[in-house]
UniProtKB/Swiss-Prot annotation:
Coiled coil: none annotated. Keywords: Bacterial flagellum. The lineage of its organism: Bacteria, Pseudomonadati, Pseudomonadota, Gammaproteobacteria, Aeromonadales. One of its GO terms (biological process) is bacterial-type flagellum-dependent swarming motility. One of its GO terms (cellular component) is bacterial-type flagellum basal body, rod. This is Flagellar basal body rod protein FlgB. The basal body constitutes a major portion of the flagellar organelle and consists of a number of rings mounted on a central rod. In Gram-negative bacteria, at least four rings, L, P, S and M are present, whereas Gram-positive bacteria lack the L and P rings. The rod consists of about 26 subunits of FlgG in the distal portion, and FlgB, FlgC and FlgF build up the proximal portion of the rod with about 6 subunits each.
Length: 132
């Protein structure tokens, strides 16, 4: 009997990749907090998750370095964030407190998905070994 990882892991396998990409975007925002003209960005999580599922659903794999890599940088996935604070005069829209808060929240959600995946993998290993 074949094991369907899509059924076993559900949406959590896709959330890990989207949350990882979001961590990169949020880190970039924090790193550029003092860069004049830098515009804070964020990922439209639901749209990125949907696109990640669709990309994975095609079963595309890069078996050669000449293959094109799939990216989550499609239009609409990474968007500019609307600033909550008034313009400081240099055109930078990064609110460091908001970025740190979002980064922490994203990290906790990533950890939650990772723990869920680990428990699913442990369950599958027990099933394969014949344990309860």
């Amino acid at each position: 009997m074949a094991i369907s990882f899509d059924k076993a892991f559900g949406i959590h396998q896709y959330t890990l990749s989207v949350r990882s990409k979001r961590a990169e975007v949020l880190s970039s925002n924090i790193a550029n907090a003092d860069t004049p003209g830098f515009k804070a960005r964020d990922i439209n999580f639901s749209q990125a998750l949907e696109e990640a599922q669709q990309q994975q659903g095609f079963g595309l794999a890069t078996t050669s370095e000449k293959h094109f890599a799939l990216q989550m940088d499609a239009p609409g996935v990474t968007q500019y964030r609307n600033p909550l604070q008034p313009d400081t005069g240099d055109g930078n829209t990064v609110d460091v407190q908001q970025e740190r808060s979002e980064f922490l929240r994203n990290s906790l959600e990533y950890q939650t998905s990772l723990e869920f995946m680990n428990s699913k993998i442990s369950g599958l290993l027990k099933a394969l070994k014949g344990e309860q």
